[in-house]
């Protein structure tokens, strides 16, 4: 699960945090310790009705680095076998499907004109909006989180703690910035965000950066977590999931760290911070921030104060994804292919749906048509409320 490596080698050390491994080095499911056993699914009083609207096959497999991108009425998605495609949001119909002719480790990011994916050896591959390969370029190390595309650039975060931008038209490297990294890093479902000309990215060690997408200059830096402890494992922390932005607020959560909301209109001043440890990520609405902790206990925090509003422990150890919003519910996927819907107001279980295809690893996406899920077997599933 961990490996030590020589200085300068990509991912100087890595901890794999997937649906089947605990950081203790033991399988959660084979352990005799009841603390790590997934909660059994229990009966509940349904509070909403959900259904599968459509299913579409992208390719084979899934992974932490594979979160589909939704733009308008289109979905861009990829799978580890090299499959890449564009799909209609309303029906799931494939508009185009292509192949990267390589195994993939991350994808797909898109701005509607350029769609980018990445390989385990750091190759970045861009497609035009007909599915034809546009260019190939090389990052300095492996890329394990989805690229982001916009403002004329394709941006990737590589395993040597570099954030790099390539010209979206021809693949020319535009800029590269690097921060010193910790001895161990987390392989997590991290995501970058592009907003108002800035690349918002977390880094191993608990930092959150806002980077000018045109120049690579760091415009702002915040601390989500501070490594603590005597050993490298105790000091392991990383910003997980996607940073969330709503108005003047930017919120993020870290493994072995905190959940924090910053005021971007006041130079990134922290508004509140609570000790918290998540392995997947968070989502926010106009009232609350929602996040599962590393044991899959879901909590809601008041967005203005950080006060804990509710906790839901009925899904404990089910390896929940980052949440998505659907109506008055919060949706999370789990290791058996179920999507659970919790009340935003009090956390009670409202609905449950099996979408099949094995463990859901990439976070569900809120769309105008419902919640989009990429399954463990490489399919897209649209879930709608009746």
UniProtKB/Swiss-Prot annotation:
GO BP field: Gram-negative-bacterium-type cell outer membrane assembly; protein insertion into membrane
Sites of S-diacylglycerol cysteine lipidation: 26
Statement: the UniProt record of this protein carries the keyword Transcription regulation: no
PROSITE patterns, A to Z: PROKAR_LIPOPROTEIN (PS51257)
Membrane topology: Lipid-anchor
Cellular component terms (Gene Ontology): cell outer membrane
Main localisation: membrane
Lipidation (N-palmitoyl cysteine): 26
Signal peptide: 1-25
Keywords: Cell outer membrane, Lipoprotein, Membrane, Palmitate, Signal
Assembly behavior: Part of the Bam complex.
NCBIfam families: assembly_YfgL
Purpose of the protein: Part of the outer membrane protein assembly complex, which is involved in assembly and insertion of beta-barrel proteins into the outer membrane.
Stated name of the protein: Outer membrane protein assembly factor BamB
Species for this entry: Bordetella pertussis (strain Tohama I / ATCC BAA-589 / NCTC 13251)
Gene: bamB
